[in-house]
Amino acid sequence: MNSILRTSIPVQMISCTDTDGKITPMRFRFKDIDGSIISVTIDKILKREDLTRLIGIKYQCTAIIYGMEKAFTLQYNYSMHEWKMIEISQQEV
């Protein structure tokens, strides 16, 4: 594993929006610090948290990243239409 993870980075997201407007993240990719493109399929959404003043939503999730199961937090900003990975556990789940 030569790649090093950074946090608070933009991600390209594939998500599903149901007829009620509920957004469910499914897969994403990001560029790590050495420039490698990392693709991630979300295994489980542990928690969904609406942010105050309708600015966005946070998702605590788990997935296999670099061959290890990791817990991480994704954030979607409604006004910017932007997804970010804002934190990731350095330890395997």
Regions found by a protein language model. Give the residues of each.
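Cysteine-centric segments in proteins
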Residues: 1-93
